Amino acid sequence: RKDEVIALRLFPAKMKKRAFSCSTFMIYLGVDKLYEEEPHHHVLFADDYEENVHDIQSEERVSDDMSIYIRNSSITDPHVAPEGHSALYILVPTINRRHDQDWDSFKKEYRDKVIARIEEKTSMKDLSDHIVEEEILTPANWQEDGVFVGATFNLSHNLGQMLYLRPHNQYQGFENCYLVGGGTHPGSGLPTIYESARISTNLICDQYGVDYEFVDYASDYLNGRVPRSEKTTEAVLSQ
């Protein structure tokens, strides 16, 4: 079929030419202690941040001098863990799967380095002594779950792949092929992906003559038509 010929000819070649985002090394922890002195969001930057970013973008090696994001959500939401316990979300940006790192053999070693850095740089000096539940996701796991080359933020946001220059929501080689997600217009990040879904949904409705209410949340917000008390994710999603 014509569609199959187009797909075989274009997709592999185009994907190889694209620049992709970093991947992430994730640690999800259940901890039998509250770290009330730690903020909800905490970012530990690499000592040599420029070198850390270069390691990731060049896709050459896993950086030992890593940057770490920690979400300590239990201090603002007591329901995410049992009383007196914490749920910690730890994200480490790292190289994607275009680099042939053996994560199965390296996972434990890298995990220990991340925990050691957190204990050194934060008030969670005894973190390793209080871990009761643990789950780790490596770039290899992301790839196994269908994330292309384990690039968790999809196409990178360089000047040649931003906004209109990202793949369009209606693919121009197929009549009934619509795209949605972080790799399409307008970009990655949860709010932006919601917008991508809205754009694609509206395009499908337009094609099949389905009426829908066009809601311009940005204009409503800026023009004061949404009360400040309602300017929350929950309020928007419930409408």
Task: Report the location of each language-model feature.
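A glycine-rich dinucleotide-binding beta-alpha-beta segment and adjacent secondary-structure elements
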Residues: 63-69, 124-186
